[in-house]
Each structure stands twice: as structure tokens, then as C-alpha cells.
């Protein structure tokens, strides 16, 4: 399945015990496996309708995946693993999220996800700003949302990779994100070289998802992503939410934006408070049996 080109192998793991990190490595391999941006597991939950687990191609387990949860929703709804009207409550590593499937001709074609509130405090992301340095390096008047204490923010913070400096602003959507707004087209940046170096900077104790963004209007953004544990992907749902949260925080966008990534367009809404709402497409590509 894929959501805006972010592709996953989804499996019902309610009655299975496997070495899932190793399974993820084998299945995700695009040359010797099925090929994907990771695997997603359906698991039972004591606190929600169902539980979602997600493993990256390197075997690491991620807290959440915005495009993945749409794939997950299509899987559990169409296979009647969860049978209910309206929104589903899904347990994830980032908390319990509410997902509303949007059905067309009897199939889940899109999904709307309440992704939770963005967090900007350095310790919540986490970002380990070196002693003696300030994480917040902007004029406070640049902030459109003043409820966030500037002494807890990492905003406009310069990082240098391969002799090039990016000014990043960081946020958590249950997983860590660093966002850099660029004047030059994002398509021309050698993200395959820069991305892994940013991911593994000592600044990020749990590594980071790195996004480069062009602002094309108050309601229109374009971005590319290097995902922690996965590399360059065609889209990143939590990343799209973090991008809009950061842009809205800095007064660069309106409440709702169309965010274009190489795999498609996501609609992201955040008015400066409450949960970020993400809506986007989901498609099943094929079904098969993995024999290891």
C-alpha cells in the first residue's frame, strides 16, 4: 500500500510472533525483498480500537507514520478487522490517534487523521543544544504564536553540513523533525548526501527527520524529506504536519496548506492550537504471501 508514494507492507500480526526488525529489513529491501519504506503491523490494543506498529527498513521501530496510518486504516477497515461507523481510535507509539476513513465506491480512498498537538520544546523533540548556545536564534517578533516560550524553542538554529549552513526549526509530532526553509528550489539540493549527515548529528539524540521546504504561498508549500531510518521518501505524513506547524508558528502560512511532496499532495491544517489535521490519499497496490 502507499499514501502519496510512501509505500508500506501491511500485515496482520495479531496472532504472530516474529523478529520484526529482521523481517522489516528483509521485506523492505528493494533488491532482494518486496521493497518498501517499512512494514506496518496490525496488533491488538487494550486502550483503542486497534494498535499500529511500524518498522523502518533499517529495522528500527518508529513512533508513528502519518502516511502509514492511512494505509493501516484502509487495511483494517476493508478487511473488517475493525468494524464501526465514523472515526477509528488507533494506538501508536505517539499516543492514541483518531482516523476518519473517507470511502468512495465502497473503498477507503482517503483518510483524515487527527495527528495530535505539535511540541516545540527542545527536550520533548529531543534536541541537545550545546551548552552555552541558544536554540532560539530569531527575533521574537517573527513568531506568529506567542504561547510558546522562546527559551525552549530551537528555531532559526544554524547547522553546517559539508560546508553548507541550514537554519532549522524543530518540532515533534511524536517523532523528531528538523525543518529548513530554502530560497533555492528544493529539487536541486543533494538530499541523499546531506540528509544522512543531518540525521546523525550529535544535536539529535534520537536522530531526526530532515525536511527542506519552499514556500510558494500562504497556502502552498513544497517539500522533500530525508526520513530517519528510511532515507529519501516520496512523502512523510508526520513531517508534513511538522512543516506546517513550524511554518504557522513562524507566521509563514495560513491555517490550511496544500503541501506538495514528490509522491503527492497532502492537506494539512493547524490553526496554532490543538491537534494538526492531515488528509491524504491511500491506495492498495497488491496483496501477496511472504515466505521469508
Regions found by a protein language model. Give the residues of each.
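Short clusters of hydrophobic/aromatic residues that line enzyme substrate/ligand-binding pockets
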Residues: 125-127, 159, 198, 290
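Hydrophobic alpha-helical segments and helix pairs
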Residues: 83, 87-143
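N-terminal, positively charged, Ser/Thr/Ala/Gly-biased leader segments
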Residues: 1-16, 113, 129-131, 137-171
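Proline-rich low-complexity regions
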Residues: 116-118, 126-128, 176, 205, ...
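Active-site donor-nucleotide binding/catalytic segment of nucleotide-sugar enzymes
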Residues: 171-173, 278
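A glycine-rich beta-to-alpha transition motif near the start of alpha/beta enzyme domains, typified by
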Residues: 1-108, 178-292
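Selected transmembrane alpha-helices and immediately adjacent juxtamembrane segments
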Residues: 168, 176-179
Amino acid at each position: 500500500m502507499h499514501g502519496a508514494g510512501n509505500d508500506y507492507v501491511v500485515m496482520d500480526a495479531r496472532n504472530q510472533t516474529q523478529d520484526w526488525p529482521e523481517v522489516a529489513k528483509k521485506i523492505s529491501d528493494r533488491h532482494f525483498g518486496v521493497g518498501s519504506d517499512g512494514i506496518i503491523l496490525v496488533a491488538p490494543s487494550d486502550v483503542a480500537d486497534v494498535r499500529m506498529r511500524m518498522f523502518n527498513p533499517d529495522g528500527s521501530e518508529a513512533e508513528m507514520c502519518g502516511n502509514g496510518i492511512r494505509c493501516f486504516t484502509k487495511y483494517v477497515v476493508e478487511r473488517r478487522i475493525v468494524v464501526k461507523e465514523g472515526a477509528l481510535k488507533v494506538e501508536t507509539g505517539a499516543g492514541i490517534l483518531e482516523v476518519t476513513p473517507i470511502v468512495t465506491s465502497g473503498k477507503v480512498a482517503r483518510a483524515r487523521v487527527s495527528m495530535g498537538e505539535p511540541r516545540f520544546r527542545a527536550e520533548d523533540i529531543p534536541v541537545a543544544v550545546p551548552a552555552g548556545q541558544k536554540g532560539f536564534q530569531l527575533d521574537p517578533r517573527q513568531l506568529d504564536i506567542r504561547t510558546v516560550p522562546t527559551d525552549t524553542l530551537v528555531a532559526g538554529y544554524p547547522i553546517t553540513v559539508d560546508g553548507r549552513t541550514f537554519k532549522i526549526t524543530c518540532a515533534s509530532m511524536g517523532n523528531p523533525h528538523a525543518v529548513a526553509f530554502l530560497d533555492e528550489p528544493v529539487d536541486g539540493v543533494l538530499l541523499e548526501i546531506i540528509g544522512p549527515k543531518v540525521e546523525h548529528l550529535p544535536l539529535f539524540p534520537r536522530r531526526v527527520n530532515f525536511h527542506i521546504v519552499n514556500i510558494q504561498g500562504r497556502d502552498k508549500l513544497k517539500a522533500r524529506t530525508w526520513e530517519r531510518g528510511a532515507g529519501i521518501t516520496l512523502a512523510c505524513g508526520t513531517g508534513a504536519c511538522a512543516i506546517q506547524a513550524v511554518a504557522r508558528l513562524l507566521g509563514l502560512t495560513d491555517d490550511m496548506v496544500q503541501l506538495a511532496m514528490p509522491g503527492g499532495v497532502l492537506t494539512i491544517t493547524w490553526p496554532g492550537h490543538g491537534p494538526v489535521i492531515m488528509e491524504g490519499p491511500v491506495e492498495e497496490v497488491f496483496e501477496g504471501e511472504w515466505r521469508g
